[in-house]
């Protein structure tokens, strides 16, 4: 709606400049206010239990399963975009201030950021890389139907396909980008500062981060749950 209003405002100004409508009419049109977007929810996200279910749906007895487990873990625990997961190299994984991080990741708009990574995610990465016997280059590689390495990297679409496979398996309707939203939402509900979430996601504006979060609305603790009305069955 706001985009359409903006186009109408521009059209009114051009019409006034070309003498097609009165200047006062154009001025009135330009003063029409747009709709505020506070609280808008973009996409979907998982609860903590759903996130755990998704990661645990992988098969730890296969090379592909270990890889996919690490992919899901890193996306949910760091908020990396699927393209960033595909681009992730061993050089990115470093220790800073006594903890594991994904260092100097170049993201959207060529913005460089460092993202803290929990130890349990590092464990899943180690399990994958040690089983695959890889120590440098891209962290995530293609695995063929014989459960053997078949390439030295993965595409962004391949990362999306991994997420879809386990989302369908777990009965969850979501995309790879929804795991990024899940990271933001779970971190916020756990008490993380919005600014720190913004920095880790690489958002230029806090407004974008707040839209990920749905502002401060908590659908699991809704006002309607406190009304107390019980109807006869």
Pin down the residues of each PLM region:
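Conserved catalytic core of the tyrosine transesterase superfamily
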Residues: 1-233
């Amino acid at each position: 709606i706001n985009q359409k209003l903006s186009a109408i405002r521009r059209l009114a100004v051009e019409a006034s400049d070309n003498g097609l409508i009165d200047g006062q009419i154009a001025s009135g049109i330009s003063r029409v206010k747009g709709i505020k977007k506070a609280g808008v929810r973009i996409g979907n996200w998982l609860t903590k239990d759903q996130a755990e279910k998704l990661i645990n749906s992988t098969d730890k007895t296969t090379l592909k399963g270990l890889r996919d487990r690490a992919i899901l873990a890193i996306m949910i625990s760091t908020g990396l975009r699927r393209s960033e997961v595909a681009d992730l190299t061993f050089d990115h994984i470093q220790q800073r201030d006594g903890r594991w991080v994904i260092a100097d990741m170049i993201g959207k708009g060529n913005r460089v950021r460092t993202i803290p990574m929990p130890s349990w995610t590092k464990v899943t990465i180690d399990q994958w890389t040690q089983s695959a016997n890889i120590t440098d280059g891209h962290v995530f590689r293609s695995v063929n139907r014989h459960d053997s390495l078949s390439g030295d990297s993965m595409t962004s679409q391949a990362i999306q396909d991994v997420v879809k496979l386990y989302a369908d398996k777990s009965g969850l309707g979501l995309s790879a980008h929804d795991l990024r939203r899940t990271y933001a939402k779970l971190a916020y509900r756990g008490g993380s500062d919005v600014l720190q979430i913004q920095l880790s996601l690489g958002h230029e504006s806090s407004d974008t981060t707040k839209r990920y979060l749905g502002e401060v609305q908590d659908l699991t603790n809704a006002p309607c749950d406190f009304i107390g009305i019980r109807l006869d069955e």
